[in-house]
Amino acid sequence: MQISQAGINLIKSFEGLQLKAYKAVPTEKHYTIGYGHYGSDVSPRQVITAKQAEDMLRDDVQAFVDGVNKALKVSVTQNQFDALVSFAYNVGLGAFRSSSLLEYLNEGRTALAAAEFPKWNKSGGKVYQGLINRRAQEQALFNSGTPKNVSRGTSSTKTTPKYKVKSGDNLTKIAKKHNTTVATLLKLNPSIKDPNMIRVGQTINVTGSGGKTHKVKSGDTLSKIAVDNKTTVSRLMSLNPEITNPNHIKVGQTIRLS
């Protein structure tokens, strides 16, 4: 499963947005920007847009999406999944994996799992109102209904292909390896400002030329194409970063489906 826009919005509401690079503590090695993105890829005077900040957040959250997917042994709803990713993003994957919340959930004791959220209200042994508020919203989302359950391993939504940068890699080499272009990789990875500055171990969104495509016909909309191909609009937009407005596609345009 993938986190939905509602899940991203929940995390955004707690993280706070900074469009200019800053150091929360002067002694920190690297700068922070966006929704808490921290690392060597943030330059001292860097300024980004809100869209770029969300893209960075999605990149950062992906590891937690993958971690939650691996830890779950039961079917969950989209809202439950979003709440779990937000929770894991805040407490860490290690704490999530060893939590009673996950244990109860995997045992099918959903009500007991939901009751665990409020217990995670401390940092350094001290209770914080911000954590009380966050847990309450995650719990409410977890308990809220969705149209139907999504079975483990049967969701039609697929993750965007990923590639982990190895020693000796550059963006041109990675593009050739995946039958794509540097320009496409930059669109898929808006957090990369300089194609010559990627680091070993960095995870990059990639795409290949062998996937299924659809040529837009008269009367097509992105929603119709998504339904016809058993996918989602958000998935299509992630596969086609050149589409910035789902209402603006043109006849003859080729859209990647996988």
Curated annotation (Swiss-Prot):
Its EC number is 3.2.1.17. PROSITE patterns: LYSM. Its main location: host cell. GO terms for biological process: cell wall macromolecule catabolic process; defense response to bacterium; peptidoglycan catabolic process; viral release from host cell by cytolysis. The active site is at E15 (proton donor/acceptor). Keywords: Antimicrobial, Bacteriolytic enzyme, Cytolysis, Glycosidase, Host cell lysis by virus, Host cytoplasm, Hydrolase, Viral release from host cell. InterPro entries: Bacteriophage_GH24, Endolysin_autolysin, Endolysin_T4_type, Glyco_hydro_24, LysM_dom, LysM_dom_sf, Lysozyme-like_dom_sf, Lysozyme_dom_sf. Signal peptide: none annotated. It is found in: Host cytoplasm. GO terms for cellular component: host cell cytoplasm. It catalyses: Hydrolysis of (1->4)-beta-linkages between N-acetylmuramic acid and N-acetyl-D-glucosamine residues in a peptidoglycan and between N-acetyl-D-glucosamine residues in chitodextrins. SUPFAM superfamilies: LysM domain (SSF54106), Lysozyme-like (SSF53955). Coiled coil: none annotated. One of its GO terms (molecular function) is lysozyme activity. It is an enzyme of class 3 (hydrolase). LysM domains are thought to be involved in peptidoglycan binding. Belongs to the glycosyl hydrolase 24 family. Endolysin with lysozyme activity that degrades host peptidoglycans and participates with the holin and spanin proteins in the sequential events which lead to the programmed host cell lysis releasing the mature viral particles. Once the holin has permeabilized the host cell membrane, the endolysin can reach the periplasm and break down the peptidoglycan layer. This is Endolysin. It comes from Bacillus phage phi29 (Bacteriophage phi-29).
